[in-house]
Amino acid sequence: MIVSGAELVVAGLGVDIEGRHIVQDVDFVAHPGQVVGILGPNGSGKSTMLRSIFHSRRPTKGTVTVDGVDVWARDTKWSSRHISVVLQETPAEFPLTCGEIVRMGRTPHKKSWRSLSEGDLALCGAAMELMEVGDLATSTFSRISGGERQRVTIARALAQQTGLLIMDEPTNHLDIHHQLKVMELSRRLRSTVVVALHDINLAARFCDTLVLMSKGTCVAAGAPSAVLSPGILDDVYKVCTHLGRHPSGAVQVTVL
């Protein structure tokens, strides 16, 4: 499942909702093929910022470009061909099978009157096997567990074959094995990945760049070793932290 990664540039992004500044002056770049982690406490603006990137919440100011194209100057059809999304929570009321959910990922790429091609179906099957949900193809989406639904949703995003993959807390509901699998997959993909996480150590281990949010602003951005300093983390999360090393060599954060 190979697709070239896109370059994402977020410049001066601001989002106001009902007169409140939810996101303010956020700048960062996700280079092709990078994994960029978005960190921050609850209410720091992570999800709102991501929605502005994938054409769901129009920004009040600033720009979002994918390979030089202003996302908000194009329609949702264009966005769905270039950006795939895994939301924090996926509605479970769909009266569809898991296979049908995954095949929805190919919809942006086909003519409305045509059926999916053999190649499309093969992509969907490969995505389901990759996420270890191939045996759920005929199961009703609403009747499987939350973790299984999350993996099916990620398979749908993979089948979409876009240069930019946005994931909002994709490891929610997943056991340790599948948390690691999702993050390892993010590293292997050639797509550019922007992922919001609460697990700082997962982010430190698997992300090339981190963007740390607090109260709607970006307080630090850069390599994990630069962003994850006790002074910054203690101030943002209001806890005491200690830095060590994971056996992989990544920074490891312990809350004291």
Each model region followed by its residue ranges:
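ABC ATPase nucleotide-binding domains
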Residues: 234-256
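Catalytic Walker B motif of ABC-type/P-loop ATPase nucleotide-binding domains
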Residues: 165-169, 174
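The feature captures the beta-strand-to-loop junction immediately N-terminal to the Walker
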Residues: 39-41
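Conserved structural motif at the start of ABC-family nucleotide-binding domains
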Residues: 8-10, 23-25
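Conserved ABC ATPase "signature" region
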Residues: 103, 118-136
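Helix-to-loop junction immediately C-terminal to a conserved catalytic motif
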Residues: 54
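Conserved ABC transporter NBD signature motif
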Residues: 62-73, 78-79
